[in-house]
Amino acid sequence: MSTIYRESDSLESEPSPTPTTIPIQINMEEEKKDAFVKNIDEDVNNLTATTDEEDRDPESQKFDRHSIQEEGLVWKGDPTYLPNSPYPEVRSAVSIEDDPTIRLNHWRTWFLTTVFVVVFAGVNQFFSLRYPSLEINFLVAQVVCYPIGRILALLPDWKCSKVPFFDLNPGPFTKKEHAVVTIAVALTSSTAYAMYILNAQGSFYNMKLNVGYQFLLVWTSQMIGYGAAGLTRRWVVNPASSIWPQTLISVSLFDSLHSRKVEKTVANGWTMPRYRFFLIVLIGSFIWYWVPGFLFTGLSYFNVILWGSKTRHNFIANTIFGTQSGLGALPITFDYTQVSQAMSGSVFATPFYVSANTYASVLIFFVIVLPCLYFTNTWYAKYMPVISGSTYDNTQNKYNVTKILNEDYSINLEKYKEYSPVFVPFSYLLSYALNFAAVIAVFVHCILYHGKDIVAKFKDRKNGGTDIHMRIYSKNYKDCPDWWYLLLQIVMIGLGFVAVCCFDTKFPAWAFVIAILISLVNFIPQGILEAMTNQHVGLNIITELICGYMLPLRPMANLLFKLYGFIVMRQGLNLSRDLKLAMYMKVSPRLIFAVQIYATIISGMVNVGVQEWMMHNIDGLCTTDQPNGFTCANGRTVFNASIIWSLPKYLFSSGRIYNPLMWFFLIGLLFPLAVYAVQWKFPKFKFAKHIHTPVFFTGPGNIPPSTPYNYSLFFAMSFCLNLIRKRWRAWFNKYNFVMGAGVEAGVAISVVIIFLCVQYPGGKLSWWGNNVWKRTYDNDYKKFYTLKKGETFGYDKWW
């Protein structure tokens, strides 16, 4: 029998003089333990990754060679008997200490949750209707909440005799309480996607929106997925391999802010405490962003080769070196936001093999294939920009969807025949094609690599063992029964039926069922993918395509099908991520369940309330010439997409112009099988084992609006971080996630201050450094061919 002791979290700025120790008893037969440790050693010795032994304790040296972060490898043993996580990135960020006696369910937790959810949801909703828009990142809430919580912890310790459970000062502001507030804000502060649907319906389809309908649409589209998140915990949240890398940045930030322990660890010669390191990075990042973000924006879009008089209007030069509509062949920037635009998830938390797979895909499809097809004028590509997120008509203007609508906003085929076919830039088409492949590849990959584990965990949720964090969590806290999540899901699906059937949505109930099934069927494969790689496959395109064939010429139905077919899964996976964060922070799962539902209800009410107020109090809202920029660009994009994707029959069916893209569904099936066969047949072929087909297909999914320029920057930074990891592993383990938290929080706070205090009131700084990068073909999204007035391009018949 072995015993692991964990000291309590420090509740104050100074270490507690009498830390609580909570023993965990782990029973195991000595023979099994010896055999297990022997298997661990054999597994580690068989791995080929090199490590830096300097400044690392012997226990961590045993497991550092096996890392999802470095090689995408999954621990094959049983982590039940390990004293810490088998993954070094988790060990370096997440503490195994816990004090379950810390009280969290008190007025201050709920007060801070309410205030931050209301403020962040309201501000983000307000600016979501403006272009350029502003979204305040939850990292800002995580940083700002800390001093406010510490101030509230200074209140006198008054109690009320009539309310015995009330205490004005429930104790020190702990990192657990901080985590509860942050988790609530992270899930609900961003504008609910349903609000873009409501904006499109109300402002562009002129639909009279009942307030009850708006609440139901927002709540159901978010909380149906919560049920799926809870019911799939055994596959998506609980396993040790479900790292959810993005959460490690938040964990490191909590630890940096709250821990005042004397750090004796020497990391490659560095002794600086992580808290001080975080503050230095945070302040430096905040101050520096003012330079590329406002004072000298040319340092952000650093296409310096195009600043000369001979290159700025040279189409070939702009195609090669352009940062906005070109290939970005000179990937240099002084602005971190250009890096973060590339992939979902922080570069500090994204495994290097994910960055490598993604960049390989970008090089093949967008640096090699795209220029070849563009300059051969395939599918009339030269009449459109090289990279663009817009669609065009046959006069090179952006496609005006209102020209093909009836008064009831259904599509009029006669008007479509009279107007123009839809032309899509090749960058957008490649993004569609890769998404088609990714949707299939994620299923094939999941079956091949995780199928047995999925079946085994279905039969026994503890199959494969539990790591130290899950053991602590399950011993110290009561879990939420599955029936809680099942009941939540049933209730929300029922309310979803009310929303789509009792109001004039033009969305049949059977289509609602199919949309929900798409989200639920994709949940486990997508959850496993995101938990390990920090990436996910967007279902927006495939749901629009499916609905376009099921319910052709019905754009209103297309809106709601995408909402329930994609956002239900997306929001559910966001909760899965936060459930993992709650496990890392050792916060009661029952409290998290209650807080998340409460925060979602409150944020939905705030979203709807703010948008309704704006509709009635801002003149010219959602018009293109609104003087303050409240043009509803997001709602307009959703509106346009719903109409265009109601016409897939005329774009992707047999004999139509873009039909060859449908072959990528087959590629998505065959490519993972081929890679798996090579890995199985040639196990010593190191290159093959690093190929991850879902990531390869879905990684470049942000192009457009991102460009290869952004992806080159992301890969370069990821490469440097991985080099540091290999050369100075101790330093990387101690400071990497803290550095990521400091950089991203500093930039996020700086963006908010610049926008609210300078740009929104009308402040401008017009000089050469802020204008030179705009005087290029790259910024103008120049086309290779320019038609004269009255000319058209394309084919004669498109129906």
UniProtKB/Swiss-Prot annotation:
<feature type="transmembrane region" description="Helical">
    <location>
        <begin position="277"/>
        <end position="297"/>
    </location>
</feature>
<comment type="function">
    <text>High affinity transporter for glutathione. Also transports tetra- and pentapeptides like the opioids leucine enkephalin (Tyr-Gly-Gly-Phe-Leu) and methionine enkephalin (Tyr-Gly-Gly_Phe-Met) across the cell membrane.</text>
</comment>
<feature type="topological domain" description="Extracellular">
    <location>
        <begin position="758"/>
        <end position="799"/>
    </location>
</feature>
<feature type="transmembrane region" description="Helical">
    <location>
        <begin position="483"/>
        <end position="503"/>
    </location>
</feature>
<feature type="transmembrane region" description="Helical">
    <location>
        <begin position="429"/>
        <end position="449"/>
    </location>
</feature>
<dbReference type="GO" id="GO:0035673">
    <property type="term" value="F:oligopeptide transmembrane transporter activity"/>
</dbReference>
<feature type="topological domain" description="Extracellular">
    <location>
        <begin position="335"/>
        <end position="359"/>
    </location>
</feature>
<feature type="transmembrane region" description="Helical">
    <location>
        <begin position="737"/>
        <end position="757"/>
    </location>
</feature>
<feature type="topological domain" description="Extracellular">
    <location>
        <begin position="1"/>
        <end position="108"/>
    </location>
</feature>
<feature type="transmembrane region" description="Helical">
    <location>
        <begin position="109"/>
        <end position="129"/>
    </location>
</feature>
<keyword id="KW-0571">Peptide transport</keyword>
<feature type="topological domain" description="Cytoplasmic">
    <location>
        <begin position="562"/>
        <end position="590"/>
    </location>
</feature>
<feature type="modified residue" description="Phosphothreonine">
    <location>
        <position position="48"/>
    </location>
</feature>
<feature type="modified residue" description="Phosphothreonine">
    <location>
        <position position="50"/>
    </location>
</feature>
<feature type="transmembrane region" description="Helical">
    <location>
        <begin position="591"/>
        <end position="611"/>
    </location>
</feature>
<feature type="glycosylation site" description="N-linked (GlcNAc...) asparagine">
    <location>
        <position position="640"/>
    </location>
</feature>
<keyword id="KW-0813">Transport</keyword>
<feature type="topological domain" description="Cytoplasmic">
    <location>
        <begin position="381"/>
        <end position="428"/>
    </location>
</feature>
<dbReference type="InterPro" id="IPR004813">
    <property type="entry name" value="OPT"/>
</dbReference>
<dbReference type="GO" id="GO:0005886">
    <property type="term" value="C:plasma membrane"/>
</dbReference>
<feature type="topological domain" description="Cytoplasmic">
    <location>
        <begin position="681"/>
        <end position="736"/>
    </location>
</feature>
<keyword id="KW-1133">Transmembrane helix</keyword>
<keyword id="KW-0597">Phosphoprotein</keyword>
<feature type="topological domain" description="Extracellular">
    <location>
        <begin position="157"/>
        <end position="177"/>
    </location>
</feature>
<feature type="topological domain" description="Cytoplasmic">
    <location>
        <begin position="130"/>
        <end position="135"/>
    </location>
</feature>
<keyword id="KW-0325">Glycoprotein</keyword>
<feature type="transmembrane region" description="Helical">
    <location>
        <begin position="178"/>
        <end position="198"/>
    </location>
</feature>
<feature type="topological domain" description="Cytoplasmic">
    <location>
        <begin position="199"/>
        <end position="210"/>
    </location>
</feature>
<feature type="topological domain" description="Extracellular">
    <location>
        <begin position="232"/>
        <end position="276"/>
    </location>
</feature>
<feature type="transmembrane region" description="Helical">
    <location>
        <begin position="660"/>
        <end position="680"/>
    </location>
</feature>
<feature type="topological domain" description="Extracellular">
    <location>
        <begin position="530"/>
        <end position="540"/>
    </location>
</feature>
<dbReference type="GO" id="GO:0006857">
    <property type="term" value="P:oligopeptide transport"/>
</dbReference>
<feature type="compositionally biased region" description="Low complexity">
    <location>
        <begin position="13"/>
        <end position="26"/>
    </location>
</feature>
<feature type="region of interest" description="Disordered">
    <location>
        <begin position="43"/>
        <end position="64"/>
    </location>
</feature>
<feature type="topological domain" description="Extracellular">
    <location>
        <begin position="450"/>
        <end position="482"/>
    </location>
</feature>
<keyword id="KW-1003">Cell membrane</keyword>
<protein>
    <recommendedName>
        <fullName>Oligopeptide transporter 1</fullName>
    </recommendedName>
</protein>
<dbReference type="Pfam" id="PF03169">
    <property type="entry name" value="OPT"/>
</dbReference>
<feature type="region of interest" description="Disordered">
    <location>
        <begin position="1"/>
        <end position="26"/>
    </location>
</feature>
<keyword id="KW-0472">Membrane</keyword>
<feature type="transmembrane region" description="Helical">
    <location>
        <begin position="136"/>
        <end position="156"/>
    </location>
</feature>
<keyword id="KW-0653">Protein transport</keyword>
